[in-house]
A protein has these predicted regions:
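Charged catalytic and DNA/RNA-contacting regions of genome-maintenance
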Residues: 1-341, 350, 354-370, 374-466
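Amphipathic alpha-helical transducer elements in NTP-driven molecular machines
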Residues: 8-12, 28, 39, 68-78, ...
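Beta-sheet entry/capping signal
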Residues: 25-28, 34, 85-89, 180-181, ...
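ATPase nucleotide-binding head domains, primarily ABC-like/P-loop NTPase cores
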Residues: 39-42, 240, 310-311, 321, ...
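Amphipathic heptad-repeat alpha-helical coiled-coil/stalk segments that mediate oligomerization
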Residues: 142, 214-225, 277-278, 289, ...
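Conserved nucleotide-binding/hydrolysis modules and their immediate coupling elements
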Residues: 469, 473-474
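Extended, charged coiled-coil "arm/hinge" scaffolds of SMC/Rad50-like chromosome-maintenance ATPases
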Residues: 509, 513-547
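Hydrophobic alpha-helical segments characteristic of transmembrane helices
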Residues: 550, 555-571
Length: 868
């Protein structure tokens, strides 16, 4: 709204000076015990939060629109505004209003955005709250995700990628980290596919920052965040322009919003080299790693099964483990050995669980300490957690595996923190420092003296009164109090002649005079000022304790990381024992051999007895398993089960099987299920083909590919042709030759076995009872050419008349098919004739000079197969 500022009151002028600096933010303007909003902000917030819109005199004829919230409960309102897409500028009083001369000084102390929240009650303990920054320049890119609430920072760099490859990589990283907020440079903002993905799938805002915000001139701000002197100290190559730019831009933004260049972060994890299994968005979604496809819930996901963690830090790390399986055998074996050692002693595992159960979120507590927003209960939680560390180290003392020994060495006892907080902070302190009663009696002599004044104020006045009676001989002398004069000595007129000369007359009343003395005035000042002085001194002592804890950041951060890792390993051990998992053998010979494998989620969510199945895949004779069988028979579950067992092994967890030998895979690809991407204007078939194309482009010999019903979104002949061509391409060792599970209802693919090297047929066993069938859920060797579609429809509950009609139509079609074969034998046009034409077409296009002997043999075999 337009406001004539010429007649505004001084305070309103001050408000507009702040608002002009933050025109796109809601300004929380501190007035006493409230944060007030004025004019447009007031109207907006009153509607958004359903607050009463009032008014305040502002120096103009009309009152300024105003709404307010108590400052002590501001967090919940801030979170609501952030969730609605607003950003909030906190404008605080920078001096005591009682001591201010004129208008109280105010300034913005913090800007709250979705990615810069640090308050524990505003965040999900089990999830990181990432803010991401993307910098793109001339085809190269760097993207960094930081969680200021935990001090976590992860950097990815991309060089020499094609535009589609870069787009795919960035979308995968953004979807995996699921940031609360994103910062782009202008060139990044021009990547329309990335922006469209964020708009339609992520539902989060993007801030396009100026190019100068990413300038190396901000490197000092970046290095202060890491308490470092150079880029080398934080593991960054200064010549990597994109990496330097994205880090400078991101941490400049963090410093600007937090109004502090605090050394909260200790390291940057860099991922320019290949250290983890790659899982794209499709694989993470189809395998339901952290949430279900249907309801987006944790229950029913792999994370739900594996999460027996006790700490918030462990929960966040577990999610990271699941989304980033290892590919280095030594690292995987270290985790598996650690889990095995933990499962070997149930008593120790139980005691570790009890100890971890009392550990608070060290990472987020330390963030609030570093940003000076920690409250008394935060420090107490830190101290209580510190007290648990000696117990945890003692329980790990006898462990022999290298990983657990390493973690034990990184857990610091933090005894100085627990001792200082234990001595200084009351056992049950108030949540707010201003409430008083935070510092223990006996910790600070001056504080004890002030508290004694408050406690014994009446006694002090009584002592002065008795002393003055005795000194002056005025028997009816008494000390009183009122708000105007404070404490005073009252003497009746009959004793005027005994009043000492040093008494200072303050008031005359009927039949009496009131006086003050220097001693009484000093006592009054001590009594009335003691409460205020207590709060000031408590704040100073609290700040000293907090700053001491801040000096221990490196120790606390290392301890937090080690405790989180231990928590995840204990969770793996607990789940493995409860669910009868086995330790997998990790191999590099290309073999996946699973005996009695089970789906980790389905077996826990079904009331039926789960039917285990074996799986064998290698890189030679059994690269591809073609799986046929009816719908609903369990093909998809079986394939997902295999993928999840491989993934569980590579995150270092035991697996649901009787035995498992797992060779490392570099990627898991999935093409499972059908879901129209309507928001992107893509049909089921288009999505399916895009996913298949991605697999054919990126799969390597070390990959695991899961394909379910490829080609079903188009005509039968098109579908069969596409499915066959895809299977042949993947199975061909000169093209990909990776381990593949291919479920299909195209029974024509059964013919691949024997014709294409490395293909083996499997099917789901079915038992037929007259017109009914029973799914045995057992995978057996050999293909089947009956999909039992009508029987499945009957099980699904289709009406009897529809089932009967379907049987009639099926009989007619089978009869026509038989007659067609007879007509073909009589010389009529048939599919065989079409095959002949196809053979001739292939031969016409073939140049024998381009064939090697091996190629010629393979080509001749294909021609023979076509003529059969």
């Amino acid at each position: 709204m337009n406001v004539d500022r010429s007649s505004l009151s001084p305070m309103m002028m001050q408000y507009f000076e702040v608002k002009d600096k933050y025109p796109d933010h809601i300004v929380f303007f501190r007035l006493g015990d409230f944060y007030e909003m004025f004019f447009d902000d007031a109207v907006t917030v009153s509607r958004a939060l359903e607050l009463t819109l009032t008014g305040r005199d502002c120096g103009q004829a009309e009152r300024a629109p105003m709404c307010g919230i108590p400052y002590h409960s501001a967090e919940i309102y801030i979170k609501k505004l952030i969730d609605l897409g607003f950003r909030v500028a906190i404008c605080e009083q920078m001096e005591d209003p009682k001591l201010a001369k004129g208008i109280v000084k105010r300034d913005v102390i913090r800007i709250v955005t979705p990615g810069t929240l640090t308050e524990s009650n505003l965040l999900d303990d089990s999830k990181n709250n990432f803010i991401g920054a993307l910098y793109v320049h001339e085809g190269n890119a760097a993207i960094c995700f930081a969680d200021i609430s935990t001090g976590t920072a992860e950097l990815f760099t991309h060089k020499d990628k094609t535009a589609p490859e870069l787009t795919e990589a960035l979308i995968n990283e953004i979807s995996r980290f699921s940031p609360a907020e994103l910062l782009f440079n202008a060139e990044a903002a021009d990547m329309t596919e990335v922006r469209e993905f964020i708009r339609t799938r992520m539902n989060l805002g993007v801030t396009v920052m100026k190019e100068e915000d990413f300038s190396p001139v901000h490197s000092d701000v970046l290095l202060k965040q890491f308490s470092a002197d150079s880029f080398t100290d934080i593991g960054i190559d200064e010549k990597d322009a994109c990496a330097v730019a994205v880090l400078c831009g991101l941490f400049y933004y963090i410093s600007d919003t937090q109004r502090a260049a605090v050394g909260r972060f200790t390291e940057i994890q860099t991922y320019s080299d290949k250290r983890f299994m790659e899982l794209d968005l499709t694989a993470r979604r189809n395998l339901e790693l952290c949430e279900t496809m249907r309801n987006k819930e944790k229950r029913g996901s792999l994370l739900w099964v594996l999460d027996r963690t006790k700490t918030s830090m462990g929960k966040r790390l577990l999610k990271s483990y699941i989304e980033q399986p290892l590919i280095k055998p030594a690292a995987i074996i270290d985790r598996l050995d650690a889990v095995e050692e933990l499962t070997s002693d149930m008593i120790r595992l139980s005691q570790l669980g009890d100890a971890l159960d009392g550990v608070y979120d060290l990472e987020r507590l330390m963030t609030r300490v570093m940003y000076k927003t920690a409250n008394p209960r935060d420090l107490k939680a830190l101290a209580q957690t510190a007290l648990k560390m000696p117990d945890i180290k003692h329980l790990l003392a006898d462990c022999r595996t290298s990983l657990i020994k390493g973690l034990c060495g990184k857990i610091h006892e933090l005894s100085e923190i627990s001792a200082l907080v234990g001595n200084a902070i009351n056992d049950d302190p108030p949540p707010l420092l201003k409430d008083g009663g935070v510092i223990k009696d006996g910790f600070n002599p001056e504080l004890d003296r002030l508290r004694n004044i408050i406690k014994n104020g009446k006694s002090i006045i009584d002592d002065i009164e008795n002393k003055e009676k005795e000194r002056t001989g005025i028997k009816n002398l008494k000390i009183g109090y009122n708000r105007v004069f404070g404490y005073y000595i009252e003497v009746t007129k009959s004793y005027y002649d005994l009043v000492p000369a040093e008494y200072i007359r303050k008031q005359t009343i009927a039949n009496a005079e009131r006086f003050i003395t220097d001693e009484l005035k000093k006592a009054e000042e001590e009594i009335s000022g003691a409460s205020e002085h207590v709060l000031v001194l408590e704040a100073e002592i609290f700040a000293e304790v907090r700053d001491f804890i801040a000096s221990k950041l490196a120790e606390v951060q290392e301890t937090a990381q080690a405790v989180a890792a231990l928590d995840v390993l204990c969770s793996f051990a607990d789940v493995s024992m409860r669910n009868r998992y086995v330790k997998p053998d990790i191999a590099i010979d290309g073999v996946i051999d699973i005996k009695g494998g089970r789906h980790p989620v389905v077996e826990l969510m079904t009331d039926e007895l789960y039917v285990p199945n074996d799986t064998y895949l290698d890189t030679s004779s059994r690269r591809m398993a073609v799986i046929t069988g009816p719908n609903m028979s369990g093909k998809s579950t079986y394939m997902r089960q295999t993928a999840l067992i491989v993934l569980m092994a590579q995150i270092g967890c035991f697996v649901p099987a009787d035995y498992a030998k797992i060779s490392i895979v570099d990627r898991i690809f999935t093409r499972v299920g059908a879901s129209d991407d309507l928001t992107a204007g893509q049909s089921t078939f288009m999505v399916e083909m895009s996913e298949v194309a991605d697999i054919l482009k990126h799969a390597t010999k070390q990959s695991l590919v899961i394909l379910d019903e490829v080609g079903r979104g188009t005509s039968t002949f098109d579908g069969i042709s596409i499915a066959t061509a895809v299977a042949e391409h993947i199975a061909n060792t000169r093209k990909i030759g990776c381990k593949t599970m291919f479920a299909t209802h195209y029974h024509e693919l059964i013919g691949l076995e024997g014709r294409v090297d490395g293909v083996k047929n499997y099917s789901v066993a079915v038992k037929k009872y007259g017109d009914s069938i029973k799914f045995l859920r057992k995978i057996v060797e050999g293909g089947v050419d009956d999909s039992y579609g009508i029987e499945v429809a009957k099980l699904a509950g289709l009406p009897k008349n529809v089932i009967n009609r379907a049987k009639e139509i099926l009989s007619e079609m089978e009869r026509e098919k038989a007659e067609g074969r007879k007509a073909s034998a009589d010389g009529q046009i048939s599919f065989g004739a079409l095959n002949d034409e196809e053979v001739l077409s292939r031969l016409r296009k073939t140049n024998p000079d381009e064939f090697s002997p091996a190629d010629a043999k393979l080509f001749l075999q294909e021609i023979c197969d076509m003529l059969k």
